[in-house]
Amino acid sequence: MFTTPSLNPGVCCIEPVRHVEFLCQAVYHGRAPEPSHKPTEALIDELLIYYYGTNLAARRAHLKAAHAIHRMGPIVIDERMQFVLFPITTSRSRNPFWVNLHHFLMCTPAGEGMTEIHFNHGMMKRVAADYNFCEKQYEKALRVLDRSTKIREQSALYITRHQKHDQPAPFGR
């Protein structure tokens, strides 16, 4: 039995927690974090299945085929709303810390092996991850969102152009 997923585009990040009962929590601006009994990737998978009829494995396969990113790549949930989550693995946990690109502002080094992630509304989170790795993940997320948006726009332009001239599109033969 499926329940409505708790994740939505307003999520700032999904962070693993050290708790007896919960594995992670979804952090939103202006409201209390929502703890979950599931790992971070299971929350994302549940959202993709419920709203988009796909799963995390399919999105990763597409990422590998279309963008040549093989591991730890950003997941485009919905490019129209710019809902993109990118992972930051921490050395202490295999349960990745996921950041919503829409709410991300910047990251700064915060000591040895630590990075501070700044969100656009003033919230900050400190993670046990290398600063250069965080920057690389951010750049990947921007590149993937940019390409997927351009691919969608180009496809729409191609179809519109053929409809204008009353020509059937050549891919339906």
Model-flagged regions — what are they?
Residues 1-99, 103-173:
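Eukaryotic intrinsically disordered, low-complexity regulatory linkers and tails enriched in Ser/Thr/Pro
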